[in-house]
């Protein structure tokens, strides 16, 4: 639902160019919150739509939103010092887990896994994932889509060499699936529902039991180190937590707002909510989330998706627990 209202997250606004990083480095030092601008990464129809609706937009600091097409791009922007805070799944930080990374995970969002699916065309003869051996399967690189596909392959004792894996953006994947260029598509969010509605796609598998459903709130380490910016991040996270709670009790209102922001029909959002595996909540860093992301990293390393094993534990920052409890 909310995490993938974004998932027209395929729409990347040009507001944050990584070539302008030097000019985007946050200022530090004395001052007041009213003089501070918190740089927040979001998706189309995301936090910039939700917080005002939930009555959480009256911040004592300014907020500059930049829309991104995916959590992998938000991860890159944080590491480029272009963003102070943003959200993504537990997958992108694995690819950024290196000693000099600037990304820190400050909270855990528990979300839906039923909107992460393997789709096949309506006339496909496939009845189980094993039937897709040798077939053209679309996925989104460095996202839950790639990890989900790897898990499905491992269940059948297959590897990426046993399929024709096609890395595509969600936008390109939807178009390719619609014109019959894919035999299956491993995808998430609004696009998965759109493919079912527009093209009659059939769900072959869901991610229930295969993905954790953990998403992450992450921040720039430089911003955390600055007292004023840290204060703004803590306040903003609390507002996001309350806004998620509002969306749970106002599903019809949220569906209308998300639809207006993204152009996807209201019915798509209501259908997503009806089919989801659980509510969306934001809470503090938790041991199970730390363990889960390390397991993702270990799985990717063993499969050769990343070049070497990585320790993801240094990415976690538990100092915002009070703001999220």
Give short role names for the model-derived ranges.
Residues 101, 158, 264, 305-306:
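Helix N-cap/coil-helix junction residues
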